[in-house]
Amino acid sequence: MKNIKVITGVIATLGIFSALLLVTGILFYSAVSSDRLNFQNASALSYQQQELGGSFQTLIETRVTINRVAIRMLKNQRDPASLDAMNTLLTNAGASLNEAEKHFNNYVNSEAIAGKDPALDAQAEASFKQMYDVLQQSIHYLKADNYAAYGNLDAQKAQDDMEQVYDQWLSQNAQLIKLASDQNQSSFTQMQWTLGIILLIVLIVLAFIWLGLQRVLLRPLQRIMAHIQTIADGDLTHEIEAEGRSEMGQLAAGLKTMQQSLIRTVSAVRDNADSIYTGAGEISAGSSDLSSRTEQQASALEETAASMEQLTATVRQNTDNARQATGLAKTASETARKGGRVVDNVVSTMNDIAESSEKIVDITSVIDGIAFQTNILALNAAVEAARAGEQGRGFAVVAGEVRTLASRSAQAAKEIKVLIENSVSRIDTGSTQVREAGETMKEIVNAVTRVTDIMGEIASASDEQSKGIEQVAQAVSEMDSVTQQNASLVEESAAAAAALEDQANELRQAVAAFRIQKQPRREASPTTLSKGLTPQPAAEQANWESF
């Protein structure tokens, strides 16, 4: 039994049930076919009875209508209203007669039914035709106002014959319906016995199938379910026995293989969970340390950014002062240039004065020469006056006066010459000094120009320095922002590392729920922090100072 496969038992069971189902289907089809035939016959008999009865009933109603017309004719009702009523009744009688003929034709054209007496059908047709002809002639005679001919017709005999035949036909029809009902009852009883026998066979087969399922499927499946529940409880120490080549044996073998794989997986997961837990703890510690140092770096960057802002303000102020100094230097240079031009004008004027003084000296020399010659002439005149005696005394007086004037003129000319020479000497000295002052002013102008250029270069350099410091400040601000973001990321990383540590701990606890055979446990190798996460305060401080 252990080597019997479930699929073989299922196929055998399906074959048995298919055979039983086939037999049941054949019997059921036979019973249904018989019932269907009986039902068709009963339906056809009912239809024929309805149509034949309808035709006979319509004929009787038609005769009643005709009798009403005949009664009115007997009463000699000849007024127009009565005549109209009789004509209407005769018309209705004709329509009823046509309807009766229609019902009878439906009966004649209906499906033939086995077991019926053809002679009885012929009698029914003859009685109908007889009654139909009598009623048709009655309508004709009454319309022709031939009451005598109408009275000679024996409608009652025709109706009696028709009713007699109809009663016989109804009796035959009832027998056929009863026969069909009896056949249906017999078929039903036979089907009941057949179904009972088949049900008994099915119960016996089900009992054998149940016993087979107990041994082949249910008991092995219960043992497998017990092993599965044991595995679900975390106990992997129970060994699973796999026997036979059936599906349950294959399932047990697969479950045993799964248990061995699960044992290896749980062992590996347990060891790796320990390693992950250790590494996660170290990562969490490193992330916390990195977060702290990142916060310190962010604080230092904030202070640096503040210092850079102050330095930027100072350099900007120096730039403004340098620009103002450049403007003042330009003003001083322009003033020095103007002073140089004034000194040049003074030098030119002093040169002109020197030239005029030299001309005055020349004129004084001429005056001195004239005075000398006048003195000589006065001396000669005095000599001549002395020679003249009394006559030349007045001339001598004049000559003496002239001589005195000439002497005074010569003396004055000498004094003027001395003064002019002193003036010329001083003018020369002043011209030299003014010339030297002009050279000095030129040197001052050149120096002020150089100072102006240097101040311009200083202002330009200060401006460039201010821009550079602003860029550095912006870079420091961006670094501060990035450091803040890094600090947030490091905090998130630390939180993730802590969460990983918690999850690793939960994984260890989850794996600890499994019980396996004692095996040599592999020690969890602690993971070392990478150099990027190793704290290096000295290096960081040195780099920060360099920055």
Curated annotation (Swiss-Prot):
Residues 30-189 are periplasmic. It is a multi-pass membrane protein. GO terms for cellular component: plasma membrane. Residues 272-501 form the Methyl-accepting transducer domain. Keywords: Cell inner membrane, Cell membrane, Chemotaxis, Membrane, Methylation, Transducer, Transmembrane, Transmembrane helix. Belongs to the methyl-accepting chemotaxis (MCP) protein family. This is Methyl-accepting chemotaxis citrate transducer. It comes from Salmonella typhimurium (strain LT2 / SGSC1412 / ATCC 700720).
